[in-house]
From Swiss-Prot:
Its cofactor is Ca(2+). This is Acidic phospholipase A2 daboiatoxin B chain. Keywords: Calcium, Disulfide bond, Hydrolase, Inflammatory response, Lipid degradation, Lipid metabolism, Metal-binding, Myotoxin, Neurotoxin, Presynaptic neurotoxin, Secreted, Signal, Toxin. One of its GO terms (cellular component) is extracellular region. One of its GO terms (biological process) is lipid catabolic process. The active site is at H55, D97. It is found in: Secreted.
């Protein structure tokens, strides 16, 4: 994710994250650990960072569109995010974002401020495989 030249999907992803959390901002995940932010390498630092690793892997499996640029449809039903639309690629991107938002919520207790604005150069371990 990159804030410069922000496109549609980043805003949607931010809204999904914020919808699943109370008083916790999407921006706390930018440049967190080894995988939250643009790119990624090494071993995820904690469960929160692993959410980003899994999200990156999910995006890598999406075929037929650019996950970081597309806009998809979704709604909230009884407190749950529901991905909509007929396009399989857009639904897949939405599902990646939905699962990540839930993962962040479920792992809020692992969030460690020492990994905020973490340098990718400190992620020297061998990268995990998707």
């Amino acid at each position: 994710m990159c804030l410069i030249g922000v496109e549609g999907n980043l805003f949607q992803f931010a809204r999904l994250i914020d919808a699943k959390q109370e008083a916790f901002s999407f921006f706390k995940y930018i440049s967190y650990g080894c995988y939250c932010g643009w790119g990624g390498q090494g071993t995820p630092k904690d469960a929160t960072d692993r959410c980003c690793f899994v999200h990156d892997c999910c995006y890598a499996r999406v075929k037929g569109c650019n996950p970081k640029l597309v806009e998809y449809s979704y709604s909230y039903r009884t407190g749950k995010i529901v991905c909509g639309g007929d396009d399989p690629c857009l639904r897949a991107v939405c599902e990646c974002d939905r699962v990540a938002a839930i993962c962040f919520r479920e792992n809020m207790n692992t969030y460690d401020k020492k990994y905020m604005l973490y340098s990718i150069f400190d992620c020297k371990e061998e990268s995990d495989q998707c």
